[in-house]
From Swiss-Prot:
Note: This protein may be expected to contain an N-terminal transit peptide but none has been predicted.
GO molecular function: glutamate N-acetyltransferase activity; L-glutamate N-acetyltransferase activity
Protein keywords: Acyltransferase, Amino-acid biosynthesis, Arginine biosynthesis, Autocatalytic cleavage, Mitochondrion, Multifunctional enzyme, Transferase
Residues at the active site: T231
Organism: Pyricularia oryzae (strain 70-15 / ATCC MYA-4617 / FGSC 8958) (Rice blast fungus)
Listed GO biological process terms: L-arginine biosynthetic process; ornithine biosynthetic process
Subcellular location, record wording: Mitochondrion matrix
Name of protein: Arginine biosynthesis bifunctional protein ArgJ, mitochondrial
Post-translational changes noted in the entry: The alpha and beta chains are autoproteolytically processed from a single precursor protein within the mitochondrion.
Family of this protein: Belongs to the ArgJ family.
EC number: 2.3.1.35, 2.3.1.1
InterPro entries: Arg_biosynth_ArgJ, ArgJ-like_dom_sf, ArgJ_beta_C
Annotated site residue numbers, Cleavage: A230, T231
Length: 464
């Protein structure tokens, strides 16, 4: 057994390694770990009519070098939709922004203002007044009355509101549409993220094949990520013309297949918000009907785009060393498949085994077995007996190099596992866990990461 002094020394080394990962607020370009730089774009194609900025305010005490106030604006009022956390303790900006969109009927929105470093959550009436004052100052600068507000950071502390309000005009003066502007804005919403999460791409629509439309998005999140949703902020902007009436269904459909299909640690935040803005600046026929070919085409674009954005969050999970796809197939329903995938994805025993490169498929099977049981008792077990049948269940590791899957369990019977090959698969940064339930044709997917020593260190030091 290790001595106390030895254990202390080991823990000190782990703390030092975690600090080297630069899990600070709003990672700057020169602090991004080498392994993550490949996920940060060096150029982009950004939607017309949008201007953005990132400004250093010092929301978190001691921050004098990293942007922590993001401003996303449209030159013309937008159609807008948002989805919000389902946590009962909803932060002040969530309450404010939900009410704003309801009042304005998802139209007439000028932009989004976001601070990192303080969540403005569980802050009472004063916190709501702070969110309202952020919107008012942004509106004053923009000459409108429709700014969405988002905040992220430590819960239970009031915003340094005067400092923020004094800097909104500066954020407005810095607005621009270049790649550097977008990257600075994406950096400003980060907390314990190690890299800014920014994407953009172009697309066409059936009714206007000669028109190039563009979509750009930024998101943040590294911990407390679990639907619906979690400390996760996202802003997606497009210059496609989309009617306010159909925008909410487009966003909800995309979020269900992306941001609501990821988990880092199983915790759901008070603040998560994803907003979609459409200003129509590229021209063309407005998407006004859910039955139109343009609606279906944009839905597909948005679904893939949102999924790719969400995956960046998992790749930056606190302490994560692996990106893991959990795919459940041959299920009786999509609901069952998603529930099983979600349960496996958030199991601490599964996640720690993955970090340790341990082919412990018993933990995967265990999580599968209790996934649908909401309460103990024989009645609960009987209720799900036709949805998860041990004799029909198969579990495999699927490598990302295109080689054959490694079967661990076949029709409820354990395979003789090639431990050497299993170790090779588990050494990779990316891998897939495949579960076949054998009860139907539906499937569901979740994305998650492993748990490492660094996760404990980061969250033990979060407020310091």
């Amino acid at each position: 057994m290790a001595s106390k002094s030895t254990s202390t020394a080991v823990w000190g080394q782990l703390r030092h390694l975690a600090q080297q990962q630069t899990r600070c607020y709003s990672a700057t370009a020169d602090s991004i770990p080498a392994s993550k730089k490949k996920y940060v774009p060096t150029k982009g194609v950004y939607p017309k009519g949008f201007r953005v900025s990132g400004t250093i305010v010092g929301v978190k005490p001691g921050n004098t070098t990293k942007p922590d106030l993001a401003f996303v604006t449209s030159d013309t009022p937008c159609a807008a939709a948002a989805v919000f956390t389902k946590n009962r303790f909803q932060a002040a900006p969530v309450t404010f922004s939900r009410d704003l969109l309801k009042k304005k009927g998802n139209s007439g929105v000028n932009g989004v203002i976001i601070n990192s470093g303080c969540a403005n959550a569980v802050t009472g009436k004063g916190g709501l007044e702070d969110a309202e004052s952020m919107a008012r100052e942004a509106d004053r600068c923009l000459g409108g009355d429709g700014t969405i507000v988002m905040s992220t950071g430590v819960i239970g502390q009031r915003l340094p509101i005067k400092r923020i309000l004094d800097n909104v005009p500066a954020a407005h003066s810095r607005l621009g549409s270049s790649h550097d502007h977008w990257l600075s804005c994406a950096t400003a919403i980060c907390t314990t993220d190690t890299f800014p999460k920014l994407m953009s791409r172009s697309f066409t629509l059936p009714s206007s094949p000669s028109v190039e439309y563009r979509i750009a998005g930024m998101t943040k999140g590294a911990g407390m990520i679990h639907p619906n949703m979690a400390t996760l902020l996202g802003v997606i902007a497009t210059d496609a013309p989309i009617a306010p009436a159909v925008l909410p269904s487009l966003l909800k459909n995309a979020v269900d297949r992306s941001f609501n299909s990821i988990t880092i640690d199983g915790d759901t935040s008070t603040n998560d918000t994803v907003a979609l803005l459409a200003n129509g600046a590229a021209g063309g026929k407005e998407i006004a009907s859910e039955s139109s070919p343009d609606f279906a085409a944009f839905r597909d674009v948005l679904n893939v785009f949102s999924e790719d954005l969400a995956k960046l969050i998992v790749r930056d999970g606190e302490g994560a060393t692996k990106f893991v796809t959990i795919r459940v197939v041959e299920s009786d329903s999509e609901e069952t498949a998603k529930k099983v995938a979600s349960t496996i994805a958030r199991s601490p025993l599964v996640k720690t085994a993955l970090y340790g490169k341990d082919a412990n498929w018993g933990r995967i099977l265990c999580a599968t077995g209790y996934a649908l049981i909401s309460e103990p008792g024989s009645a609960a077990v009987a209720e799900v007996s036709d949805k998860i049948v041990p004799e029909k269940t198969n579990v495999s590791f699927v490598p990302t190099d295109g080689t054959a899957e490694l079967k661990l369990l076949v029709d409820g019977e354990p395979e003789q596992v090639d431990e050497v090959r299993a170790a090779e698969i588990l050494k990779a940064e990316d891998l897939e866990i495949l579960v076949r339930l054998g009860t139907g044709k539906a499937e569901g997917t979740y994305w998650t990461c492993d748990f490492s020593h660094e996760y404990v260190t980061i969250n033990g030091d979060y407020r310091t």
